[in-house]
Amino acid sequence: MPTLEERYLAAKQHLFRKVYGARLNPPQCDAVFQTEGPLLVLAGAGSGKTTVLVRRTAFLIRYGNAYHAPAPSGVREEEVGILETAAEMPPEQIEREILPLFIDHPCPPWAILAITFTNTAAKEIRERLLAELGDEEVASQIVAGTFHSVCVRFLRRYADRIGFDPSFTIYDTDDKKRVLTAILKDLNISDKILPPKTVANAISAAKDKLQGPESITDASSPRARDIRRVFEAYQKKLQACNALDFDDIIMKTVELLESCPEALAYYQNKFRYVLVDEYQDTNPAQFRLTELLSGGSRNIMVVGDDDQSIYAFRGATVKNILSFDKAYPDCRVIKLEQNYRSTKCILAAANAVISHNSDRHDKKLWCDAGEGEKIHLRETEDQNAEARAVIDTITAQMVLKHRHYRDFAVLYRVNEMARAFETAFAKSGIPHRILGGQRFYDRKEIRDMVAYLYIIMNPADNLRLLRVINEPRRGIGDKSLDAVAEIATAEALSMYEVMAHANRYTALARVAPKLVEFTDMMNEIRTAVEGGELTPSSLIERLFIRTGYRDMLTAGGEAEKPRIDAVEEFITGASEYESRAETPTLAGFMEEVALVSDVDKYDAEADSVVLMTIHSAKGLEFPVVFLPGMEEGIFPGAQSIGSEAEMAEERRLAYVAITRAKEELYILHTRERMLYGRTNANPLSRFVKTEIPESLLDIADPPRSFAPPRAGGYMHGGYGQGYRTPTPRPDGTPAPRRQESELYRRVEPPKPQKNAATFGVVRFAPGTRVRHATFGTGTVRSARDMGGDILYEVAFDSGMTKKLMATYAKLQKI
């Protein structure tokens, strides 16, 4: 027979479940109530993970550890009886009158850290917490932000402990490339042999693992030695410019916490609870960061789905979520498998595909929604017919199903597929947006304005200084700038400091007035900022005018008006930041600008069709989704085939793509596709042909006169290479063919696939010694047929390994 204490605890927990169970399913309730210790929530696609994050955070603030707290000492039978009777009350009354009696160590809002991967996710959490708590002051005190934005706050506070000034600036991908290009030139290393992007990737990969230049230790490889030299020079350049790149932001924060006991103690004591969203996308540095931050209380909750880990190319490792229970042996694991987004048919297809991955947490999505429509599988002649088929379907659904344009999304595997769709949509007049095209902040005029702002904030930023010193033209030549750089290096000063005192240096005598005029102008504006006279928006406006940038654009006439409009929109963005920030500062605005992403700019209410890569679509959902290019060599990609790890990632990407669809999913492929300047006849993707059950597919028959022969079947290689000639008229002329929808438009029988010999490509066996015009001599590791070409993997003597298409590589046997 249960004791009074056990009855009390059971009655209390029953009351909590009655209240929260009205809005959450049982596993979601489990996650909300599990407040203490490590917690891994495996949240399948569309399973309500954000709801759980928000409700759990609100629960911590309202009730603390109320659900699991033991019965008070000396509890009486009457008290237990009251609780057991209270179960008959309506949930609203229980929440209002009974639950507050159980509050146990509620958590102050500022002691909760919620880390996300996008600003949009952080904003949604804050907004939903406000709605849940009903108290703006409380909701605003929760620290919610991206990994980078949270770490920037930490670094500003303790920058001096790691050798930086708090006014440090942040270098983005383009800035990083510019610095590396200059370093390669200084070191006399050809950017053809060692491209800046290759070095950038190597540096990022090292920093993601919390490693520096010393980690590149292959002394026998000239390429590795060069990368290390560039890496070392790059870090020195960043230090001299008081700048950090994106990877440094995480790495330097870990360095701070590991080397500064004061900082570690401060943040471990400050944050009683650490919550991490999208944990499957974390890299080793982020794993270590969250481990350090939660090391005091060990109250860490991570939410994610290993089946949606799709960012290995950015350094993410699925191992973090797969081995979380090994890193935290006492953790509790809760699975959210009920989907609130898609139909049964769509989920069945997603489950079928992902089940072919072996190294994963076992889970299976299910839903209470209906079966829904089968997945529509369509074949078209080529990429242009594919795009027109999508447009025809959208046009028909707008009429027949009264949809909005925003209900549709076209998700493609690679950006290069966007061209055919962009052309077709432009001709059709259908409103559309391409997410992932040129970002607003990548426009030249915006990058120039951002550079001016960074110079105001951090005069030591030589990279930004060189970008705008002649924007607009000021008559300061390259030789003069080289002289400034030499003096700065010799005297351990920033280039800005040398320019400000140019009159002291005879080498700068001729150009000194222009240099001093520039720095005097910038110093005057900086003084106004420091004196509180200029907000970020008014600062941009003053820089736009005082620097002469506006006059330069105005002189360009009507052609430059869009650039003026862009800067004015930038000013508007700064004004919006000022209205929502509690304490608007230039540093705060610059952090927001530096850390914005494409998805953060996505507007779900804009009534237009969205075109984007599958990677960009993660976290989004649409009533109708089109997946073009579901073909071998594209999805999965050619270079992933043959690698178990890369194929597993491609399959996870397919799972993500399928689960973006709420109501209808269209999968498209072509008989021939031109991509990267070549035309290939790619087979239907294995993800569809062999992994999705045929019973889930609606396979459209081509028009009757072009029907494929029954033998073989569509899903088993019978693609229909014959057609029946229309019955002739009595006068002997052919009968007219009936007009067909573009979705099922007539296609010619597929042409025999060309083999490598047709193109005059010579096959080299593995082990063959070859020469390449740029990369030098090397040894063929493997050769794979690729739709009429050969994909070679060659290990070059320089130490690099390249995958090259034979047609373009023009390898010579030696």
Predicted segments, located by residue:
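Short glycine-/polar-rich loops that comprise or flank the Walker A/P-loop
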Residues: G37, C107-A111, V138-Q141, G296-N299, ...
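Conserved beta-strand -> loop -> alpha-helix junction used to position metal-binding or nucleic-acid-contacting
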Residues: A139-R153, D172, I430-A451
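Conserved helicase NTPase motor core
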Residues: Q13-A45, T50-L53, P72-E84, R96-E97, ...
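C-terminal accessory regions
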Residues: T554, G629-K803, Y808-I814
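Post-Walker A helix-loop "phosphate-sensing" segment adjacent to the P-loop in P-loop NTPases
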Residues: L60-A69, C107, G134
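Helicase P-loop NTPase motor core
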Residues: T50-L53, L83-P106, P329-R332, Q338-P431, ...
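Conserved helicase C-terminal RecA-like lobe
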Residues: I216, S220, H404, A418-I430, ...
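Conserved P-loop NTPase-based nucleic-acid remodeling module centered on helicase motor cores
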Residues: P109-A202, E214-D218, R378
